[in-house]
């Protein structure tokens, strides 16, 4: 299925994920970034992104996690900030992405305190 968001342009690329009925653990795990000028049934992949499927303690490490991708984007934007391409918008995006990491880290810490981090327990 194609992933759409009103805040993202799809002028050059489109993002796809498996259909909802194929989701495991309540979320999509497999994404394709494809060229926007292709028909949906003929996606020309640029890159594949596979997220962790299931808790690590139960399934081992089998994909990237949210924090990995956020860290990549922060690193990329920070490199632009250290160049002539520095701008307010990049600085704001970095701040918000760092905030994302903080909240995801808090979720992890809360689960560690409960003794359920890395498991499917709620």
From Swiss-Prot:
GO MF entry, a single one: nucleotide binding
Impact after mutating residue 90 to A: No longer binds 2'cADPR, partial loss of anti-phage defense activity
Keyword Hydrolase recorded: no
Binding site for 3'cADPR: 52, 54, 76, 80, 85, 90, 107, 111, 118
Effect on the protein upon substituting residue 80 to A: No longer binds 2'cADPR, no change in anti-phage defense activity
Family designation: Belongs to the Tad1 family.
Subunit field text: Homodimer.
Function in brief: Blocks activity of the Thoeris antiviral defense system (ThsA and ThsB). Binds and sequesters the cyclic ADP-D-ribose signal molecule (cADPR) generated by ThsB (AC J8G8J6), ThsB' (AC J8CSK2, probably 3'cADPR), BdTIR (AC I1GTC2, 2'cADPR) and AaTIR (AC A0A1H7VGH3, 3'cADPR). Sequestration prevents the signal from activating the Thoeris antiviral defense system; heating cmTad1 bound to the signal (95 degrees Celsius for 15 minutes) restores the ability of the signal to activate the NAD(+) hydrolase activity of ThsA (AC J8G6Z1).
Protein name, UniProt field: Thoeris anti-defense 1
